[in-house]
Every structure is written in structure tokens, then in C-alpha cells.
Amino acid sequence: MAILQFNKQALGNLEYSLQREMLSTNRAGGYMNTTIVCCNTRKYHGLMVCPVETLGGEDFVLLSSLDETVIQHEQEFNLAIHRFPGIYEPRGHKYIVDFSYTPTPTIIYRVGGVLLKKEMLWVHTAEQLLIRYTLLEARSATRLRLRPFLAFRSRHGLSHENMEADGKSYPIPGGVKSRLYPRFPWLNMQVSKEAKFVTAPDWYHNFEYLEEERRGYPFREDLLTTGYFEMDIATGESVIFSGSTAEVQPDRLVSIFEEEIARRTVKTEFLPALYHSARQFLIIKENHTSLTAGYPWYNARSRETFIALAGITLTQPSLMVDQCVEILDYHVENRLHDGIFGTHFAADTQLWFFHALQQLESFIQGGKSEIWARYGTAMKEILYAYRDGVGNDRAENETDWYDDERERYIHMADNGLIWADMPGRPLTWMNTMNDGQPVTRRPGFAVEVNALWYNAVCYTLELAGVCGDDAFVKEWIEMPERIKDNFRATFWLEQNPQQPYLADYVYHDGEKNADIRPNMLIACSLPYSPLNEYEQQKIFTVTETYLLTPRGLRTLSPNSPQYQGICRGNEHCRNTARHQGTVFPWLLEHYVRTGFRLYGKGYLMQAKELLGGFEEDLLNYGIGSVPEAYDGDAPHEACGAISYAPSVAALLQIHRMIRDSERHS
């Protein structure tokens, strides 16, 4: 893979550099996210974005940017870049000669005879940003000015000039502290050497965020600066800026930075970059570990957690079994109520939990017995909830369920399959909505929900049998055959006998939806499949023909009249396209797993080609990571979250499949 590095020509081209974002995170939940030239293009961008427990634990942008100015002979050279209406000002990107992502995001500026290096990182376990400035070359006396711009607002919002903001700065050792509004933490801004802080509070107006404008959202913001630091800096000298929610000792900043840089791994190769990206999703907060679904706008979400967990934790060179178990334990102990995780209305989330357990089994000490001891009760609770039905007692209001014989919106029908339907609410992972209605409504029997249901029932019976739960086995032993028989009878389509496949969902009176979607492939890839080898081969072929791209699987065949090949524009446009052709990398795991299941070592070359195709893409969009989605049409440009846990997990799972296949060659 090309080293995660960019030269002056690339950095100076804003059409190129503003489309590439860097991300630095820590275990405490904080992160830094901006473009590789440090020009914010999203409301989610900022140097310090971190959870604020006094405001519900949501993420807030405290420090939006830090503008650097090099001063020589009373001439000022501003290294920052911002977009204002009709102009970029200042245009500090013209001074950038190099950007490197490893071991930590590093920018080198050339201003005449001055060569200045900037290294940025988040402290591993604290809400603390460190930026080290090193003057590599200078032909005359040099001063450095640092001006912080403060936001103190939700990452989902924008700030505007107001009378409530406290523009004062209060002295602390080595710097100042500011807090624009009550209930926020103090932002302690300190430097590692003696410096003057010049108090000069002022609002700067109409910062523009290009990506928000493209996405159809408000995109202008006002930011407050309380003043600036100014200090001399000598050739060969380093100065460290610290932004933190806790006051630190200035003389400790150098050692803290050195300790943090030493723990960074080199990320110049494809797999180390993926391993590093995977670890960025793990957050330790309130004494438990969670898995963030993606950056920069997602929090932890149960569906994404169960889909991605094994790939994030169990593919690392140093296995993270304890973290995997801790996350699963937390969900069972704190989020499972009456067989449903949290209050999320979803027919599939609980069933992905079983798949996560299946993948954990071979890594946890005690194997099947330990899985059953820890999770057997939860597994049975979920199955009983699905069998007996989840309905209006969990609805938010009386309109959230049918007032007829199907008032329980998720339940097992007489044929053993799971029926899921609620007016005005999507219940599967294809869950976007426009104008209060699902875009991709899939009511009734959804194919992947029932494949997951079959897998969950079979796996629970397997463990119950091994561990001696005879009563459960006796009660459920006939279910797998019943589900399997009716699964094929319900979903199998032979409109074209030469190319049969599965209906995406089946509604009233057996009406089969014939859209070619990737959900049917999940029925082939799970450890327990309700399909035989012939059926799996047919589905694999249809998937390869209509849905496979170099970046994942399309959510709908291009031959469909509803197909949308570009996922761009305002929220309505993006929601319309999201599951109508947009490509998702996480689905590739199921495609490759099915390929190995059907063709064994004969599939190795194609699997390698698919995985290798992502190497160069780590230089795009969210550098060093894998995005949430891509356009369905070539050239398959990235869209959605810049770094998405299920996407990264899928590629790491594919790498493990390839490695296992090679070991058995």
C-alpha cells in the first residue's frame, strides 16, 4: 500500500485535499477530525470533540480549530485555512509541503526559510489533545502565535454569536481556561514553555462547512476566540500545546507527548492501518467498553455492535477476547429487556447477537459451555420473545402497531417464520425514512431476518443439547426443520428457472417481492443455513452478477426501476438512494464467506482480489479507514461515515478467511 502520506502538489489542490479527512481518537471517547489541510468542512469537524457527561454524555465540539501564525521581522504568515462566503481565508495550505498519517497526523509547513513541523494526537485515556510544534529550520528570529477558536456546542449543531457566551479567559499555570456556557467542562489550554496570552475576545462570523452545504444542512457558523498565545521558538526547539478538560502540569507535557507517541504503531501498511482503525471504535466510558458504530456522527448502536464485534476484536494480532466479552455482557445486563435490546424497534438486531456469540465461541476459554453459562438465559429469552411476539406493550404510542390480529409487530407465524411489520416504521437494517415513512419498506417475512432466526434457533439448540438443558431441547427440537421447510417454500423464486434466487420479503397472501437485494446472501453465509448447496450456489451467482462491485455489494440490482446509483445531495435524496443501490462493504464479508463455503481454496484468488482492492482506497475519504458506503455506480465514490465499524470489521474478517484458507492449503 502507498504510505499514508501526501505531497505539496496534492495538498495544495483543495478539490483533492478537502475530500480527505484525518481522524485521531482515544479510549475515553474523544476525537479529532478534520481535513488533511486542517480546514473544517463539516459541523462534526474539530480538534477537540468529546463526550460531556453533564450534558447527557453526547459529543460536543469544544475546540474547533487552532490557527498558527509564524512571525519573522514583524511579518505574519498565517498557516490556517478557513472557508468564508466566496473565499478561503487565510490560505495557509499553500505553505504545506508534506502530510503524514503515521505514527500520528503530522504536517510540515515551509514559509520562506522557516520549516515547521506540527504533530497532533489525542492522549489515550484522557480528554486531552496535544499538538507539538518543532521549528526544523529558520534563518532569523521566529515567533509562533496560536489562536484557538471555541465552539462549545453539539457536534450535530452550529454556534452563532450570542450574549450568553462567556468570552473571558482565566489564568492557570502555563495558559488559560475558558468555558463558554455553564454545565460544560472547562477547556484548559496550556503550553509547555513560557508564553504570553493576549486577551482579545472576538466573534468570527460565517465559517462555512462545504460538506454540510452539499448535504443540504445549515452550513454557516460563528466561532469565538478569547485571545491568542505568542512565544519565541528557536531552531530545533519544540513547543507543545495542550487542550484538556483537566488542568495539567505544563512541565509534564513533553513527557506525556513522548509516552503517547511511543505507543503509536506504524500504519504504513494495509493491515496495520486496518487494525489501528478497528481499535478506534472501542470506547471505555462509565466503566464499561462500548463499540462506536462509526465516525464522525454515530454512537454505539446494538445492530452495528453485533455485526462488527468479532471483526473488530477477534482479528487483532493481540486478541481482544476480554473486550468482546465485556461488550456482550454489558448488552445482556443493561440493555436486554423482555428479549429486546434497548428500545430500538428492529427485527434483526437481537438475532445478530447469536452470530456474535458463534464467532466468540472458538476464542473463549470453555467454548460452548462458557457461552451457554454466560448467555444461555439471554438466548432463550430472545427466542421466546420472538416466538410469543413483541408488540404494543413496547410501542411508543397507540399508532405504532396494528389494531387487528397482528398487533404484535414482531412474532412467529404459524409456519415458524418471523413476521415483522409496523405502520410507518422500518424494522430491518434498511431503515431510512422520508417524510415520516420508510423508504425501503420490507413488511412481513424478511429474508435475512428469517435466516438469522433459523441460525439462532439451531445454535441455541446445539448449546442446550451439549450443556444438558433437556427441557429446552424437548420444547424446540422440531423447530429447525419446520423453519427450514417453510423458508424455502416462502422465499424461493423461479421466475427465471435458469436464475432462481430468494424473494427479499413476502407479504400478504404470499406476495413475493422479487427485488434482487443482498439480504438473501446472509441466508447462505451463516453457520446454520436453511439452504442446500445448490440453492446457495444459485444465490451466490445472482449476487455476483447483479450486486457485486469492487467496494462491496449493491443494495439493489441496477436493473431495478427503483435503482439509485449515486448517494448524494440533501437528506431526502440520500435517504432515497441509501438502500436502493448504494454499496455497503460490510456485506462483502457474507459474500466472501459464502464463496469459501462453496468453493473452498478455489475461491482464494477472488477473495484476495476483493480485499486488495481496498488498499489504495485507504488514501481517500477517511484516510487509513474504510467508509460506511459507496455509490452504486462506478467509480464508486465513498459516502456516509468516513470510518465505519462494520466495514472495517468485514475486511479484517475476510483477511482471516484468506489466512485460514492458506494455512490449510
Predicted feature residues:
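Terminal accessory carbohydrate-recognition/targeting modules of carbohydrate-active enzymes
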Residues: 1-266, 303, 318-320, 329-333, ...
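C-terminal capping/lid segments that line or modulate ligand- or cofactor-binding pockets
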Residues: 2-54, 342-366, 500-543, 566, ...
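Aromatic-rich carbohydrate-recognition surfaces in CAZymes
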Residues: 137-138, 159-162, 171, 231-235, ...
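Glycine-rich phosphate/pyrophosphate-binding loop
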Residues: 195-231, 429-446, 558-576
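Inter-helical turn/loop segments and adjacent helix faces that build the functional surface
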Residues: 251, 360-374, 459-477, 534, ...
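Catalytic cores of carbohydrate-active enzymes
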Residues: 268, 272, 387, 391-407, ...
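Acidic/His metal-coordination segments adjacent to aromatic residues that form catalytic metal sites
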Residues: 283-291, 333-344, 419-445, 509, ...
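Internal amphipathic alpha-helical repeat/solenoid segments
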Residues: 283-305
